[in-house]
From Swiss-Prot:
UniProt organism field: Hydra vulgaris (Hydra)
Similarity field: Belongs to the arminin family.
Modified residues (Alanine amide): A82
Residues spanning the signal sequence: 1-18
Protein name from the UniProt record: Arminin 2b
Amino acid sequence: MKTVFAILFLAFIALTYARSYEDVKEEIKNEIEKEILEDLEEESDELNDKSKEINDAKPWRWVRRIRWRKLVPYIPAVVAAAGKK
């Protein structure tokens, strides 16, 4: 009778270990996938940030948009107004 209980006990331990091993294996797999996805997300964010910095080939482009011919007549008036105290 003791041998039967011992065999059943060992079988129970083996089944429990097999289930927990599969659970642990699945959990490790999920953690690794999660870390990989987080790393990829961080790298894509870094690439997006770098592309924004590098993308602007002409940083003074907004200066060219100003219509200087329309603004030039007003410059003396602005200077005179700024010079008065």
